[in-house]
Amino acid sequence: MEEVPHDCPGADSAQAGRGASCQGCPNQRLCASGAGATPDTAIEEIKEKMKTVKHKILVLSGKGGVGKSTFSAHLAHGLAEDENTQIALLDIDICGPSIPKIMGLEGEQVHQSGSGWSPVYVEDNLGVMSVGFLLSSPDDAVIWRGPKKNGMIKQFLRDVDWGEVDYLIVDTPPGTSDEHLSVVRYLATAHIDGAVIITTPQEVSLQDVRKEINFCRKVKLPIIGVVENMSGFICPKCKKESQIFPPTTGGAELMCQDLEVPLLGRVPLDPLIGKNCDKGQSFFIDAPDSPATLAYRSIIQRIQEFCNLHQSKEENLISS
């Protein structure tokens, strides 16, 4: 192919030959026809790599700021409490990687081994990978277009040496973007268990979650369920509950009923969650009996039950 624009969407992109940057490119017709696209060998390589990963869970949200990364981190912490369970946490929020901070791993670097990139470990059974580990400073801005993000996700899925893993948790950016399309495409043949969608109770968040649910259905991504985060505040002294974000349209419960998706649970606001995330520590350690911790544990149990059922169905399909 001839010289292409710097901001080319890529011959394999859905926007190939159709995007604004394609105007005037000598390869526009070729890309629009699909003739410029070539089979991506990485899909088979990733499928092979993922054979050592038992369960794969995507964590999604319609909006930023609803606690998606906090949930991903505490899902990983909760599952890793069983020392015999191996957990991998992959942060593909390329432009806003917050997992290194939440997991207490800021300043850590990625190391190369003979079998690929080595994850950074919080515990012996909890490994983490994030683009944040590749930045010289946490304040560095990542200003990448779709093809470069796609390449980074491909490299994470293909080249990170997780070893034998029970749960791979993928923390995604908010919304439905290139990153979501890439990870679903690359893991399509590796059998994703499903997605957990995080929301807050108010309608301004729920309206984007409806779009997220429609996205999952369009790309045939199973929905494990919805978590309503910041669902009320329980006063630690009087135990009275206050609605900080009022569910003016019925909250996640009514939305889940209307769209026929499971509501996994509600996590109340707790100031300790934010404090512990800033310190890079698990909230469960400091507040083992708080309403938020108990809600998390119930949700984690339901996710495990879903994954075990999904695994049984996969095994039955293979045996038949």
UniProtKB/Swiss-Prot annotation:
Organism superkingdom: Eukaryota
Gene Ontology CC annotations of this record: centriole; centrosome; cilium; cytosol; Golgi apparatus; nucleus
Leader sequence segment: none
Gene3D superfamilies reported for this sequence: P-loop containing nucleotide triphosphate hydrolases
Major place of residence: cytoplasm
Gene Ontology biological process: cell projection organization; centrosome localization; intracellular iron ion homeostasis; iron-sulfur cluster assembly; negative regulation of centrosome duplication; protein localization to cell cortex; regulation of cell growth
Residues where Phosphoserine is found: 319
Residues with PTM N-acetylmethionine: 1
Keywords attached to this entry: 4Fe-4S, Acetylation, ATP-binding, Cell projection, Cilium, Cilium biogenesis/degradation, Cytoplasm, Cytoskeleton, Iron, Iron-sulfur, Metal-binding, Nucleotide-binding, Nucleus, Phosphoprotein
Xref: InterPro entries: AAA+_ATPase, Mrp-like_CS, Mrp/NBP35_ATP-bd, NUBP1/Nbp35, P-loop_NTPase, YlxH/NBP35
Chain residues that bind [4Fe-4S] cluster 1: 8, 22, 25, 31
Compartmental location: Cytoplasm; Nucleus; Cell projection; Cytoplasm, Cytoskeleton, Cilium axoneme
Cofactor(s) for this UniProt protein: [4Fe-4S] cluster
Cofactor note text: Binds 4 [4Fe-4S] clusters per heterotetramer. Contains two stable clusters in the N-termini of NUBP1 and two labile, bridging clusters between subunits of the NUBP1-NUBP2 heterotetramer.
Binding site for ATP: 62-69
Binding sites annotated in the UniProt record for [4Fe-4S] cluster 2: 235, 238
Pfam families membership: ParA (PF10609)
UniProt keyword annotation of 4Fe-4S present: yes
One Gene Ontology term of the molecular function aspect: nucleotide binding
Family as reported in the entry's similarity comment: Belongs to the Mrp/NBP35 ATP-binding proteins family. NUBP1/NBP35 subfamily.
Subunit structure: Heterotetramer of 2 NUBP1 and 2 NUBP2 chains. Interacts with KIFC1. Interacts with NUBP2. Interacts with the BBS/CCT complex subunit CCT1.
Job of this protein: Component of the cytosolic iron-sulfur (Fe/S) protein assembly (CIA) machinery. Required for maturation of extramitochondrial Fe-S proteins. The NUBP1-NUBP2 heterotetramer forms a Fe-S scaffold complex, mediating the de novo assembly of an Fe-S cluster and its transfer to target apoproteins. Implicated in the regulation of centrosome duplication. Negatively regulates cilium formation and structure.
Name of the protein in its database record: Cytosolic Fe-S cluster assembly factor NUBP1
Provenance organism: Homo sapiens (Human)
Lineage summary: Eukaryota, Metazoa, Chordata, Craniata, Vertebrata
